[in-house]
Amino acid sequence: MKTGYLIDMDGVIYRENHLIPGAADFVQALTTNGTPFLFLTNNSAPTPEDLAVRLKHLGIHGLSARHFYTSALNTADFLSETDPSCTVFVIGEGGILTALHERKIANDAIRPSYVVVGEGAATTEKLTKAHVCIERGARLLATNPDNWCPVSSDKTRPGAGATAAFLEASTGRRAYYLGKPNGYMFHRARQKLTELALGQPQQGVMIGDTMETDIRGAFEAGLQSFLVLSGSTRLEMLGDYVYQPTRVLQSVADLVAEIKTGKPSDRMNSPAFAERTLPGGRFGQRHQTDVFALHKPRPRPAMTK
C-alpha cells in the first residue's frame, strides 16, 4: 500500500512569510514521485485557492485548490452530512463563509440551527447576536479548538477556540469542535487523499509540528505521525505526553531523499537519538491511566523583537 501524506502548514512548510528550508524540495519530491498529499490546516479564514496562491508567492508552484483541506471545509462537510437543511449564524471571515455558501447552507441571524465560529470578525455586536441565538436554541459549533492564531513573529490574535470559549462561558452551553484533532477532520482528509490517489487506498501519515492537534489527531485516527521540530514543539516537550509521534524529524527536508528513493532514513528516528535527548526511554514516554491526562493547551510562540 502506497503512503500518502497529510501535511500541516504553519511551522511545517512556512513560518510567517518564509518557507522553511527544504520545504519546496519536499513538495517537489512528492509531486515528481506521484505521492498523494493533502495540506491540512485548522485556519478557517483562507480558502484553498488563497492557500495555493500563498504557497506560489513563497516559491512552491503547481498546486491547486484540491491539495488543501481546511477546518472551514470540514465544517461545511459536517453540516452537509449531518444536517443538510440547517441554517447558521457565522462569526468568521473568508474561507468559512465561502465553504458554507458553496454548500448552500443559509444564513439566519434570528433563529439559526447553529452558531458557527471561525477565525476573525468576533465583534461585540456579533458575539451578542450569537449569544442570543444560542439562548434561543442554536447549537454552538467551532471550526477548530485553537485559542490563538499567529499574525507575525511578535503578534497573535484570538482563534476560533477562544471565541467559542467566550460563548460557552456566557451561555453555559458546550461547543462541538471540528478541525484537528477531531476524528471527523481526519476521516474526511483520508477520503480526500484517496480521491487524489484516484481511488487507491493509502497508508496515511500526518506530518505536523503540534502535539495537541496534529499528533493527537493522528493517534486517535490510527495514523502514523511525523513530528517536525521546525515549528511550535521542542524535543524536550515530548516527555509531557503519553501519545507519541511515530517519528521525529528536524524538518520536512529530512524526508526528501526518502521520498525520492523509497528508502526510509533512520537518522532522526533512532532510539539512541531519543534516549540521549530525554530521560525515561523513548521520547520520555510515561505510563498514565488516562491516556490524555497530560494534554496541555497549545504553547504560545516565543515573541521576538
Question: What are the residue ranges of the model-derived segments?
Answer:
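A cross-taxon signal for low-complexity, glycine/charged-rich
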Residues: 274-290, 295-297, 301-305
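Asp-based, Mg2+/Mn2+-dependent phosphohydrolase catalytic module
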Residues: 2-9, 14-33, 44-69, 76-273, ...
